[in-house]
A protein has these predicted regions:
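Conserved alpha-helical substructure of the radical SAM core
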Residues: 2-133
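Structural motif corresponding to alpha-helix initiation and N-cap regions
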Residues: 61, 92, 119-120, 184-188, ...
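Residue-level preference for beta-strand/loop junctions
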Residues: 27, 37, 171, 266-267, ...
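Flexible mid-to-C-terminal extensions adjoining Fe-S/redox cofactors in radical SAM and related proteins
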Residues: 2-27, 286-360
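Exposed loop/turn and edge beta-strand positions of beta-sandwich/beta-sheet ligand-binding modules
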Residues: 29, 80, 269, 278, ...
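Radical SAM enzyme [4Fe-4S]-AdoMet core and its adjacent flexible, acidic
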Residues: 1, 52-55, 59, 128-129, ...
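Residues immediately within or flanking Cys/His clusters that coordinate Zn2+
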Residues: 32, 36, 40, 263, ...
């Protein structure tokens, strides 16, 4: 699959026009709060290199609430999802208080969890705290999942979490799988496992060379393996038994429109902002701290959102190196911002060129 058809090209043009609109208007839709850097696992692929105890303390809820009050003063909070992420959010003892405070201000509240602490009792607490969105990590069958997570109990905990979240009323939830060379051959088994467990939404990620994953290149997919992942997603979408998609990770050329419900554009700084555990304000949390735009302890969050983020909203500066003469730059705009190192260079071959490298 190497050539885009006329319909795809028209949709890419439409997406390009929409991106230009977002650059001008930048309506905030997703606000990620790194509520802790502590974690109860030590996963091989962790992009944040999280530990059981962190040198950076959890941000007090009282420090984050003024950010929400600022946002609510300038836009409709019911249209903004506040995602509590980590680390592992459930290691934070006041997480339910955080969730209630978010909901009391009219925002939607979501969370990404490894599931280790999520049982039926915790699910009831989450429901009472008003959670609206949740993602659970399942990274393979038992052997592959436990290997990636460095834990002998994490697979059973994740499956228990899947059972528990189905008791939460009106919850939007999905399963996230980080695909690597070990679990790629078992994607069909994983698919059947998830369907049998009641999962209807499934997002697949490939692993990027960040955090601990930067030290273990075996976690990264080869060009051919990456193509196989995308082909699996296309086939599974056609089957219609589970709603599967590839993550918002990068521009995919001829696979655009086939593996996601939308055409790629990096939303960091356009509709997505983040507050790190130390107060830094950025686009998405996967982006290096070099690109932080301010800090809530010295800056107004809303002023930063409205008047900074130039690097995010005008990405012509990314048009160098392999992007300089690339025919896809108009549409990919330098690919996912998180793939840039501190010098602005790509940390890996972009997905578009990965797919082009394959000899058909």
């Amino acid at each position: 699959m190497s050539v885009m058809n006329a319909h795809q090209r028209q949709q890419l043009e439409n997406t390009h026009d929409y991106m230009e609109h977002l650059k001008r208007e930048h309506p905030l839709r997703d606000l990620f709060w790194e509520c802790t850097l502590r974690c109860n696992m030590s996963c091989r692929h962790c992009g944040s290199d999280c530990l059981k105890e962190s040198r950076v303390p959890d941000m007090p809820l009282a420090d984050f609430l003024p950010v929400l009050d600022e946002v609510a003063a300038h836009c409709d909070p019911s249209q903004v999802m506040v995602e509590t992420v980590g680390g592992e959010p459930l290691v934070r003892p006041d997480l339910m208080d955080c969730g209630r405070a978010i909901r009391e201000r009219g925002f939607m509240w979501g969370m990404v969890t490894n599931g280790l602490k999520l049982d039926h009792a915790v699910a009831r607490e989450l429901a009472q705290a008003g959670i609206t969105s949740l993602s659970i990590d399942v990274d393979g069958m038992r052997e592959e999942h436990n290997w990636l997570r460095n834990s002998t109990t994490s697979f059973d905990a994740a499956m228990r979490a899947i059972e528990a979240v189905q008791t939460i009323p009106d919850l939007t939830w999905d399963v996230i799988t980080c695909v690597n060379g070990r679990n790629l051959p078992r994607l069909n088994e994983i698919k059947n496992l998830l369907i049998e467990a009641g999962v209807t939404q499934w997002r697949c990620f490939s692993i990027d060379p960040m955090g601990r994953a930067a030290l273990d290149k075996s976690l990264l997919l080869t060009d051919e393996q990456f193509r196989d992942l995308l082909n699996f997603i296309v086939t599974t979408r056609c089957e219609g038994k589970i709603d599967i998609s590839y993550a918002c990770d990068g521009f995919l050329g001829a696979y655009e429109g086939l593996v996601r419900d939308y055409f790629f554009y990096c939303q960091a700084g356009l509709t997505v902002a983040s507050v790190r555990a130390n107060g830094d304000i950025s686009g998405c949390l996967s982006i290096r701290s070099d690109y932080s735009q301010g800090n809530i302890y010295r800056d107004s969050f809303w002023d930063v959102w409205e008047n900074r983020f130039e690097q995010f909203r005008d990405r012509e500066w990314m048009r160098h190196g392999p992007c300089k003469d690339c025919e896809a730059f108009r549409y990919c705009q330098g690919d996912g911002f998180h793939l840039r190192d501190g010098n602005g260079d790509l940390m890996m071959t972009c997905h578009y060129k990965q797919l082009k490298n394959i000899k058909l």
